[in-house]
């Protein structure tokens, strides 16, 4: 039975659209506002949906903005780029007739990317460049499973809820493959960077990460924080907690996982997530 599901997932990966053009263009943008601001404006102006999304976000704050240039000024270069990436990726998978709220899934992914960037800026600046994208895409395998083996994936969510177990364990039991493995195969199909593929594959299994362990640890940490803060819903009903391996990795950045010590970081994340309507 597992073989049947894995074949179905494999077939779906082959038939999936290529990496969205906008996302591919955003991957190529370096994190230098001075050099890339004009390129970002051109990407947005060529896409009516991106333009509308940015303007709607600004105007929902009670500010009146009608132009892309002004919208980027208000949002900031990084947030504007992040919104474009999230929007372009979510359009690849149009989920219909599902009992699962796909928007909450995307909200969780967006939240993890946002928190990963915040943590990187505060504790490990070398990871800032990849932090948001890695966080945004870490659970992309769930979206593939939801779209192509939706009924079985919903059963995995129900099993996670019934047992209070990690969702990836329920996926393994029912499908023979977890969302990390599916996501990593999609990353290979789309020729995404190895660092992103490793995050997808190992964010629930840090000891297996070798080349990009710090980035995997960062996203794992951000994922747990978002689950604690109830930012979106990734369908995982296990009690969020920090493994010894993750605690060791975070200790290298002098991150104290005691609740009181984490409070300032949590408040910082809450403020940013609330600003983006992700809680």
Where are these regions (language model features)?
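A conserved active-site-flanking secondary-structure segment within enzyme catalytic domains
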Residues: 160
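Terminal helices and disordered tails flanking the catalytic cores of nucleotide-processing hydrolases
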Residues: 1-8, 244, 249-279
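Conserved alpha-helical "signature site"
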Residues: 1-155, 167-242, 278
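Active-site-proximal region of nucleotide-activated glycan assembly enzymes
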Residues: 163
């Amino acid at each position: 039975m597992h073989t049947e599901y894995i074949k179905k997932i494999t077939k779906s990966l082959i038939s999936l659209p290529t990496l969205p053009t906008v996302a591919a263009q955003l991957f190529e943008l370096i994190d230098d506002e001075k050099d890339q601001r004009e390129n970002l404006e051109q990407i947005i102006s060529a896409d009516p949906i991106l333009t509308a999304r940015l303007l709607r976000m600004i105007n929902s704050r009670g500010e009146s903005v009608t132009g892309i240039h002004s919208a980027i000024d208000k949002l900031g270069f990084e947030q504007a780029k992040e919104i474009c990436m999230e929007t372009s990726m979510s359009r690849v998978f149009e989920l219909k007739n599902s009992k699962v709220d796909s928007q909450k899934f995307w909200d969780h992914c967006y939240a993890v990317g946002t928190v990963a960037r915040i943590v990187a800026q505060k504790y490990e600046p070398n990871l800032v460049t990849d932090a948001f994208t890695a966080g945004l895409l870490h659970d992309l395998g769930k979206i593939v499973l939801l779209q192509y083996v939706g009924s079985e994936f919903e059963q995995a969510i129900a099993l996670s809820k019934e047992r209070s177990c990690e969702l990836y364990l329920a996926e393994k039991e029912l499908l023979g493959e977890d969302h990390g493995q599916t996501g990593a195969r999609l990353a290979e199909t789309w020729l995404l960077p190895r660092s992103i593929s490793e995050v997808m594959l190992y964010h629930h299994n840090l000891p297996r990460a070798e080349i990009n362990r710090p980035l995997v640890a960062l996203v794992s940490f951000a994922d747990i924080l978002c689950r604690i803060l109830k930012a979106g819903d990734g369908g995982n009903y296990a009690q969020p907690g920090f493994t010894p391996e993750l605690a060791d990795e975070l200790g290298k950045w002098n991150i104290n996982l005691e609740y009181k010590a984490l409070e300032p970081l949590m408040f910082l994340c809450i403020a940013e997530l609330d600003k983006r309507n992700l809680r």
